């Protein structure tokens, strides 16, 4: 019993000493809160900031804080696509564009139907002029040029060849063809010209030979009405001649109009 009471009395004594600690007996040393508050800066700073604030110069050169990228949500619009709408009205036609390059030639089409016959045309006027004459007598050169005359007519349409002068006179402006055939004389030259008006155009020539031969010459000439064409034997500066006889015709002169031209 004594022991119990003694312990109780001891507990009361310890309580008296501990109460000042519990209720905060004032002391001269600062409390924990006062100590922390005294060390805090006047301005609010983050724990990672440096102790000294940046000077204005340092502020200009300071690296800006990292900017977080903007995050935009992606929406799959295809899942929101609706049904196809009706066709809208046509717009105003634009200006015509530039002409393009010519395309390639297409394939040939099918043959069309036969057309109707046209009205009859006016009758065309056809002009003719032709002659062919021959000589059955031989001829020798003389002191002057000799006009070759003919004694046989094969063709002479409209009498354009004058048998008296041995000349063909052109009735129309156009292109004409002429040909001359002769038989040379043994041991003599054959020297003959086809002459247009008074100008020798072409020559028919054969050298002297012990054998006689046939020679020919031809030419085309443009003529106007009144022009004349004839055959001339060269004068006696050379021993010259052409052969023929009464049995056969060795010498012929022919010509005809190829194409008439408008006057």
From Swiss-Prot:
Is Ribonucleoprotein there in the keyword field?
Answer: no
InterPro entries named in the record: C1q_dom, Collagen, Collagen/C1q_domain, Tumour_necrosis_fac-like_dom
Give all residue intervals belonging to the Collagen-like domain.
82-123
Glycan-bearing residues: 76
Any one Pfam family match given in the protein's UniProt record, by short name: Collagen
Q: Which residues form the signal peptide?
A: 1-24
Q: Does the keyword Transcription apply?
A: no
**Location of this chain's protein in the cell:** Secreted
- UniProt-recorded Gene Ontology molecular function terms: identical protein binding
- GO CC term, one of those recorded: collagen trimer
Per its UniProt record, what PANTHER family does this chain match? Answer: C1Q DOMAIN-CONTAINING PROTEIN (PTHR15427:SF52), EMILIN ELASTIN MICROFIBRIL INTERFACE-LOCATED PROTEIN ELASTIN MICROFIBRIL INTERFACER (PTHR15427)
Q: What is this protein called?
A: Complement C1q tumor necrosis factor-related protein 6
């Amino acid at each position: 019993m004594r022991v119990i009471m003694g312990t109780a009395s001891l507990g009361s004594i310890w309580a008296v000493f501990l109460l000042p600690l519990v209720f905060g007996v004032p002391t001269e040393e600062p409390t924990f809160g006062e100590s922390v508050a005294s060390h805090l800066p006047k301005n609010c700073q983050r724990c990672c900031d440096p102790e000294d604030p940046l000077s204005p110069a340092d502020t200009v050169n300071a690296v800006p804080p990292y900017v977080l990228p903007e995050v935009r949500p992606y929406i799959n619009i295809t899942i929101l696509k609706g049904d196809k709408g009706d066709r809208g009205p046509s717009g105003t036609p634009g200006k015509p564009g530039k002409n393009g390059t010519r395309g390639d030639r297409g394939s040939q089409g099918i043959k069309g139907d036969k057309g109707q016959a046209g009205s009859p045309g006016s009758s065309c006027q056809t002009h003719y002029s032709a002659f062919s004459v021959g000589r059955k007598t031989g001829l020798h050169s003389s002191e002057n040029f000799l006009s070759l005359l003919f004694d046989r007519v094969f063709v002479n349409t409209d009498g354009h060849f004058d048998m008296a002068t041995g000349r063909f006179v052109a009735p129309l402006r156009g292109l004409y063809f002429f040909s001359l055939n002769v038989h040379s004389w043994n041991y003599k030259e054959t020297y003959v010209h086809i002459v247009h008006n008074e100008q020798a155009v072409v020559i028919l020539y054969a050298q002297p030979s012990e054998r006689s031969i046939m020679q020919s010459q031809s030419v085309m000439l443009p003529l106007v009405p009144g022009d004349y064409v004839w055959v001339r034997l060269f004068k006696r500066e050379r021993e010259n001649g052409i052969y023929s006889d009464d049995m056969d015709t060795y010498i012929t002169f022919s010509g005809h109009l190829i194409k008439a031209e408008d006057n």
